[in-house]
Each structure stands twice: as structure tokens, then as C-alpha cells.
């Protein structure tokens, strides 16, 4: 159990020469937030722009400097809870004293501010597509624990990269994969499932300032119509209609079946849309004393007269001056178990498979060198490699892919 009365913070800045300074004693206003629909953590503070032994604070903190926020509970936890590079630098001079206002964003901010054109051929895996974007923008990666669904042909023109990544993860979830998100922690990026936190904090009325619950059908989808590709005249044919809670009225979504997508798969995707967006939306807002270790995507438990259940954190704002935080929560629905008929396919040497794209390695052993390979058809030439880290050996069967080496489980179907 955490003792909130013992929470303490420190703020460390790294200057242009890589020197580090604890500037907490100069900070007047500090907060950080993670918002729904965004990838990056936003940190802001106002500091007294006093003269130090190294000069005025504004001479130490400059645009591009790295700022880290650390918190301790006075016992077992003492860790970095937010970091960012100074993007907005605003020294203010006034008669009552000088101040410095700064806004910082972490490594994922460049994806929120960068547009690109991306083409993913049919069969591209989620992992390959997302890691390709992170590699191109030179964003350090820690781990990938996310989905690796096979996507239909996807063309994204003039789209923000953060939106492309969110769309890929949402599409994978519609195909039955676990809902995941991208998070930067200590300078490295990971793709992880919601609710991956090991410690689940409980919020009760006696340790919380405010609970507010909302129930809404405003954005509810009650019918999905599956259509085929348009003909030369631009007309599309209706191939299936999947109904949900139509008692709330018809709120229709169109799903266009991909060229290489079966009707059964398209209907399954339509059902996933209803499963995800065809429910009454139940959200709750909680204001409580600050628990600085809680992040967006975490699982928490709420006990109040309004609700007693598990929730995912959709957005969170930490305010250090008032030692408080505000969480926007989404009900954590029980995870659906896949049908027993969905058994893992048994692949054998000689099978022709669809490689999702990604990395192929020079050997099956851990630590072997890897190279990027394109999505496409390939033949399994060896299974159960003795090194076990990359157990499958694939060789491409056409010029679409260039895979010729050892690959991981789950990188083909």
C-alpha cells in the first residue's frame, strides 16, 4: 500500500553539455498529462528564473534540453514518471520577479507532428508496419508486446504518423487481437496491451475527492454494412449486413471488404466493430490525491456508490502543486475468449505462407544479426531451428518479398 503523504518529486534538467541539475526548488507550477488520442506525454512547468551558480535558469534550460520528472513514495518506489524535451521556452520578465515557462514532450511527439504517405501491401503485419515507422523516425524501441494481425492493403496519404499507428492498432483489435497502445518510458518506446501494469491501484470514496460517471449512446454503432469494391461506375454492392443493438435506432457504419479478404473475414471484422463501438459507453472521471506512478493505459479499480469495477485509464493529468490528479476512465470489459475452433494452425516444411514483413535473421540463435524483409509469399524450408529464438526458415517465392532467413513465431500466416 502506498502512503500518499510521503510522495515527493524532483525535476532534473540536462543541459547542452550533458550536465544534470535538480531544479525542483525553483519550480512553482509542475504538471504532466497523457491524453486520449495522443501518443506523447506533455510536461509543463513554471520556474523562478533566478540566478544560480551556473547563471540564470534560462541560460541552463534551453529549447531541446531534456527534462525528467521523478517521484518517490518514501519506501520502495523511486522512479522516473515523465520526461520530455523542451519545445516551448518562454522567459517572462516582470516587476515582481522573472519566470521561465516551459512545455516538454517525449520521443513520440515527432510522430504527432509529422505527416507521411505510407503504403502497406495486403498481408502486412501490425508489428512490421509500426516498427517500420519507428525505425524511419529513429525512435528507440524497448519491446513489442502488441498484435501482429494481417492487414488488408492500406494506403495512408498525408496522415499524421501517430494517427496511422493508432489506426493500425485499432484495426488489429477489430480483427480480434488485444487492444494495445504505444508508450514511451525512460526514453524508449514499447507497444503493450492495456492493463499491463503489475500494481493495480484501488480508488475508494475515502481516498478520492470526486467521482463522476457518464453513460452515453451518442456514438453507438448499431449496424455494419459490408460492401465490395466499387465498379467502374463507382457503385458498390452490399455483400452482408451485421446488426447490433438496433433498438437504439440505426447508426450505420460501412466496411469495405479488401481485395484479398474473404467474406467471412469481412463479416468477422464487422462484428468486431459492433463489439467495440456497438455498446453503451460508460465512462467515469476520478479526481484524487496524486499517485504519480499511474499512467495512461493502466488498469485501476474503482469502489464507489456509482461503480465498483475495473477501469482502463484513457487520459490522466497530474498536478504537483495541489498533489492531485484527474483520470478519465473507461470500463474494462471482460476479455472475450476465442472460440475453441480457432486452433493454432500447424505449419510444416514446404508450406507456402504469407510473411507479414519485418526482420529475418542469419541464424535461429539468440543475438543473431537481423535485416529488414518485405511482406509477401514465402516457403517454409526449415522448422524448429535448433537455436529456437527464430525457429522458422523462409525463402520468398516471388519478387514481392525478399525474405530469405530465420524468422519469429507469428510473423506469417
How would you describe each model-predicted region?
Residues 44-47, 104, 117-143, 156-183, ...:
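Amphipathic, non-transmembrane alpha-helical segments in extracytoplasmic/periplasmic proteins
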Residues 343-385:
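Beta-loop motif signature
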Residues 395-413:
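Intrinsically disordered, low-complexity, charged/polar segments
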Residues 2, 90, 97-111, 143-218:
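Short beta-strand-centered interaction patches in the first periplasmic/extracellular domains
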Residues 89-106, 319-332, 386-394:
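Short, solvent-exposed secondary-structure boundary/capping segments
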Residues 30-60, 209-358:
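An acidic/polar, Gly/Ser/Thr-rich interaction patch typically located in mid-to-C-terminal regions
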Residues 1-109, 204-213:
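Assembly/oligomerization scaffold segments
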Residues 80-90, 309-319, 372-384:
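Short beta-strand-centered aromatic/proline hotspots
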Amino acid at each position: 500500500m502506498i502512503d500518499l503523504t510521503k510522495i515527493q518529486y524532483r525535476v532534473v534538467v540536462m543541459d547542452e553539455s550533458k550536465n544534470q541539475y535538480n531544479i525542483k526548488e525553483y519550480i512553482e507550477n509542475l504538471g504532466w498529462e497523457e491524453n486520449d488520442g495522443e501518443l506523447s506525454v506533455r510536461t509543463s512547468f513554471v520556474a523562478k528564473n533566478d540566478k544560480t551558480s551556473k547563471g540564470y535558469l534560462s541560460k541552463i534550460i534551453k529549447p531541446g534540453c531534456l527534462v525528467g520528472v521523478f517521484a518517490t513514495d518514501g519506501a520502495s518506489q523511486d522512479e522516473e514518471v515523465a520526461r520530455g524535451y523542451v519545445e516551448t521556452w518562454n522567459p517572462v520578465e516582470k516587476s515582481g520577479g522573472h519566470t521561465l515557462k516551459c512545455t516538454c514532450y517525449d520521443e513520440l511527439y515527432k510522430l504527432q507532428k509529422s505527416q507521411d504517405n505510407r503504403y502497406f501491401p495486403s498481408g502486412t503485419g501490425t508489428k512490421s508496419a509500426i516498427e517500420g515507422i519507428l525505425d524511419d523516425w529513429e525512435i528507440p524501441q524497448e519491446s513489442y508486446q502488441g498484435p501482429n494481425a494481417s492487414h488488408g492493403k492500406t494506403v495512408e496519404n498525408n496522415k499524421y504518423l501517430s494517427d496511422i499507428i493508432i489506426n493500425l492498432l485499432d484495426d488489429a483489435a477489430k480483427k480480434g487481437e488485444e487492444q494495445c497502445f504505444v508508450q514511451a518510458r525512460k526514453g524508449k518506446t514499447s507497444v503493450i496491451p492495456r492493463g499491463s501494469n503489475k500494481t493495480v491501484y484501488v480508488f475508494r470514496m475515502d481516498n478520492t475527492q470526486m467521482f463522476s460517471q457518464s453513460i452515453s449512446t451518442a456514438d453507438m454503432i448499431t449496424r455494419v454494412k459490408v460492401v465490395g469494391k466499387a465498379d467502374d461506375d463507382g457503385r458498390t454492392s452490399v455483400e452482408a449486413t451485421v446488426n447490433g443493438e438496433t433498438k437504439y435506432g440505426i447508426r450505420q457504419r460501412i466496411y469495405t471488404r479488401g481485395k484479398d479478404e474473404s467474406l467471412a473475414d469481412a463479416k468477422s471484422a464487422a462484428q468486431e466493430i459492433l463489439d467495440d463501438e456497438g455498446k453503451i459507453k460508460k465512462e467515469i472521471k476520478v479526481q484524487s490525491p496524486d499517485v504519480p506512478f499511474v499512467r495512461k493505459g493502466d488498469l485501476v479499480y474503482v469502489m464507489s456508490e456509482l461503480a465498483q469495477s475495473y477501469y482502463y485509464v484513457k487520459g490522466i493529468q497530474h498536478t504537483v502543486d495541489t498533489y492531485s490528479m484527474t483520470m478519465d476512465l473507461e470500463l474494462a470489459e471482460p476479455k472475450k475468449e476465442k472460440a475453441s475452433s480457432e486452433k493454432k494452425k500447424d505449419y510444416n516444411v514446404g508450406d507456402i505462407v504469407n510473411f507479414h514483413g519485418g526482420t529475418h535473421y542469419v541464424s535461429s540463435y539468440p543475438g543473431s544479426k537481423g535485416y529488414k524483409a518485405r511482406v509477401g509469399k514465402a516457403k517454409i524450408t526449415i522448422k524448429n531451428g535448433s537455436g529456437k529464438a527464430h525457429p522458422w526458415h523462409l525463402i520468398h517465392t516471388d519478387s514481392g518479398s525478399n525474405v530469405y532467413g530465420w524468422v519469429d513465431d507469428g510473423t506469417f500466416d
